[in-house]
């Protein structure tokens, strides 16, 4: 986030991800998907295909909701993953959440967005950021919602062994405009600064009394 001559918030609370990935519907064949008389145009572009898939998933997400009786639903987060190895891609729920937030903020439909994509217009973000998977071994400790420092457990026991906790963190890039101010802000009239902000996610931790449990902790989530 970029702030102009104003105090900055340290933390914001984000909503938690859905319990399961929404289903994906496939309709029609290649000819019907590309429209009538489009045989000479070939398959649709990868970008349009990706947007179509996300649109389907967002539609499904509005219908598929975790059961109110399922007490484990709040243990899932779009930025936390339990895995035996480092994930190769950003979490799907995170991509859906970020994409939906963008559409909601812009108050526009998917088709309108296709013609106003910043990447297609050559636009740059106000603050440069970097996202990567971080292990509990790298984090070691974190601050919970009560302000106490807790130990982030590296491994989570499961019926067939143990899985590692991974956190998908986003922070300001040291190679960007973090020290020089926000991109596009007139330095003659405004003082600006790119800062990493945090949100709460659910993770398995241990407090100073050796009590292990799932708690909300702060991690870097945006710039």
From Swiss-Prot:
It is found in: Secreted. InterPro entries: Brain-der_neurotrophic_factor, Cystine-knot_cytokine, Nerve_growth_factor-like, Nerve_growth_factor-rel, Nerve_growth_factor_CS. One of its GO terms (biological process) is nerve development. GO terms for molecular function: growth factor activity; nerve growth factor receptor binding. The keyword NAD does not apply. Glycans are attached at residue 107. Residues 6-114 form a propeptide. One of its GO terms (cellular component) is axon. Belongs to the NGF-beta family. Promotes the survival of neuronal populations that are all located either in the central nervous system or directly connected to it. This is Neurotrophic factor BDNF precursor form. The gene is BDNF.
């Amino acid at each position: 986030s970029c702030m102009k001559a104003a105090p900055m918030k340290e933390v914001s609370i984000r909503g938690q991800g859905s319990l399961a990935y929404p289903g994906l519907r496939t309709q029609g064949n290649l000819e019907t998907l590309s429209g009538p008389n489009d045989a000479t145009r070939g398959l649709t572009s990868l970008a349009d295909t990706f947007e179509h898939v996300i649109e389907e998933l967002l539609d499904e997400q509005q219908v598929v909701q975790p059961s109110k009786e399922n007490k484990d639903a709040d243990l899932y987060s779009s930025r936390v993953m339990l895995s035996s190895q480092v994930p190769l891609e950003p979490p799907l729920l995170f991509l859906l959440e970020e994409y939906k937030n963008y559409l909601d903020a812009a108050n526009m439909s998917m088709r309108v967005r296709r013609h106003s994509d910043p990447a297609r217009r050559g636009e740059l973000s106000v603050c440069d950021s970097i996202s990567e998977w971080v292990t509990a071994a790298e984090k070691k400790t974190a601050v919970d919602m009560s302000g106490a420092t807790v130990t982030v457990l590296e491994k989570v026991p499961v019926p067939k062994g143990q899985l590692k906790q991974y956190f998908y963190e986003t922070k300001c890039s040291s190679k960007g405009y973090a020290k020089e101010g926000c991109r596009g802000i007139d330095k003659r009239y405004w003082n600006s600064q790119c800062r990493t902000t945090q949100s709460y996610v659910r993770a398995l931790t241990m407090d100073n009394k050796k009590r292990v449990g799932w708690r909300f902790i702060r991690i870097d989530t945006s710039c």
